[in-house]
Amino acid sequence: MHDRRVTTGFRGLDDILDGLRIGDNVVWKVDDIKDYRYFVEPFVKQALVERREIIYFRFGQHPPVVRADLDVETCELDPREGFEPFACAIHAIATAKGVGAFYVFDCLSELLSAWATDHMIANFFQVTCPYLFRLDTVAYFALLRNRHAHKTIARIRETTQVFLELHNRDGELFVHPLKVWERHSPTMFLPHRESGESFIPLANSLEATNLLAGAYSQDQAAGSRRLDHWHRLFLQAEDLKAKGVAAAEQEKMVAHLCRHLIGREDNILSLARRFFSLHDLLSYKARMIGTGFIGGKAVGMLLARRILEAQPDTEWRDLLEQHDSFFVGSNVYYSYIVNNGWWELYA
């Protein structure tokens, strides 16, 4: 029978947090993935000593955060298949493993390039974290600093049990607990400097202020990155159109936008790249509510219209009714399910 208390693998960090608890989801907000890896390895090694089953969800483009020579089961997933297949696959694996397994996830920021929107990362965490909690697991996650909207970070922080900011200042590591569920101490929520095997609280207000001010200035310098990835992508597309860049560069952007707006089926994407212009895709986005795919029937209608208009022998533009459709993005549908607490019925 395992104890409810779990070690991080760092005695000093255990002292700060009063250890981890069974059910904890631990989110690390980091500057660099190698800093996350530094804290993952001792956690994994100690869990193996305690004969825990550990599953590593591998889906990022960054180097693995768990060494291949450790006795850990690696489950490789492709987030480009979409939110639903990705979230359902993790749900199914966790269900099959049952109670008591431990999990390490690649950096969640990697999902941005696949899903194009912060909002769905928060949705993913909101459906995954509570389920792992009920299965008596301990799970490690990471987010890269300055890559996500404030609202996304807030939703993840609200959902998780433990949220830790990790600062690396010229190789010196500082851990700043922002949330530790159902635990408290007089110094728990101060920044702590790693010193040997210990973590020393920055009780000196000047030191703490300098550390946090440095992090704040980085946040301010990255102001444009506070925009959701989806909106940044379309701002880039609008900029390309306004500048009148070469056709090849516009075609590259069209292909990129199609993967986030039109769908994933190769035959449909091939037609979309052929018949849709950058102007077309930007006009469709302007008629969207939310983010995600506009839907198969809508894509079929738009493609059929463009194919007809491309015919040289008929003035279809004079015959067709004016286009007046609006679109509800697929992410609105998923968000409706998640926010109403119906995901497990759906999954």
Q: At which residue positions do the language-model features occur?
A:
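Structural recognition of the conserved hydrophobic beta-strand(s) that form the central parallel beta-sheet
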Residues: 28, 56, 104-106, 136-145
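Short, charged/polar "capping" segments at the starts of alpha-helices
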Residues: 36, 61-67, 148-151
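Phosphate-binding/switch region of NTP-binding enzymes
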Residues: 137, 143-197
